[in-house]
Amino acid sequence: MNLVFIDQLINHFNWTGDTAYVRQMWPLLVRHLDWEKRNFDVDGDGLYDSYAAIWASDALQYSGGGVTHSSAYNYRSNKVAAQLAKIVGADGSKYEAEATKILNAINQQLWMRHKGWYAEYKDLLGNKLLHESAALWTIYHAIDEGIADPFQAYQSLQYVNNFIPHIPILAKGLKDSSLYTLSTTNWQPYTWSLNNVALPELLHTALAFWQGGDKEEAYRLWKSSLMESMYLGASPGNIQQLSFYDAIRGELYRDFADPIGMAGRTL
């Protein structure tokens, strides 16, 4: 999960403006980007494979294909590396070139113009088919990492509205009937980490709605998610990992770090 840590590190740089720490961590960033390119873009097409990269990775693999969410992570990391290179006195041109290459590859090969959202991934072998049923993590990473332009973001969020299962949140004494939650994918059959009702995924999707300009839907999903976890859950005030509405596991864990982080970002 180097990708996620590096993304966190970039956010830290942006938040603090600590250029001394940028210089200290620059060698790590260089090694990380070299490692990503060497292992996950072996064919050099600008699309990156994903292996043990995100929360859902337990049962998630792409057999060497080009993946939207991992390519988006690498786009931002290279884009920012090109900017940070000026601070540390390094040549950032190769990182700028790689970011451009990634963005072009995503738009040419993974963005489905006829549908209006990103494919989950593209097969490495055979007919190099696109897997068109994107997960939540594909949509929100595309928006959060900056590969989606405003119209692509709008269209991708309509995919969430229209193709990701919506589950009403209902409870005795709960008067607000507008609350709902989402499953992470529309994939079948059910298996762990591939089709869950997971609070960090919901909060990151709410953030994507805010970033995409739909503040009303963002707040409704955010409120729904926190109400279901902190008020309706088995442990008052808890920030859970999985929801009561998860089909197999049900409510899971107490004050899990992933949703705590996303609750902080959305707040």
Predicted segment positions?
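C-terminal capping/lid segments that line or modulate ligand- or cofactor-binding pockets
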Residues: 1, 5-6, 119-159, 191-267
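The feature captures the catalytic groove of carbohydrate-active enzymes
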Residues: 1-4, 34-98, 104, 109-144, ...
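Hydrophobic or amphipathic alpha-helical targeting/insertion segments
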Residues: 8, 12-16, 22
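Alpha-solenoid helical repeat scaffolds
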Residues: 15, 84-87, 215, 228
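Alpha-helix N-cap and loop-to-helix initiation/capping positions
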Residues: 21-24, 94, 264
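Long, well-ordered core segments of solenoidal/helical folds
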Residues: 25-45, 98-117, 149-178, 215-234
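Charged, glycine/proline-rich intrinsically disordered loops and linkers
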Residues: 170, 174-183, 243-252
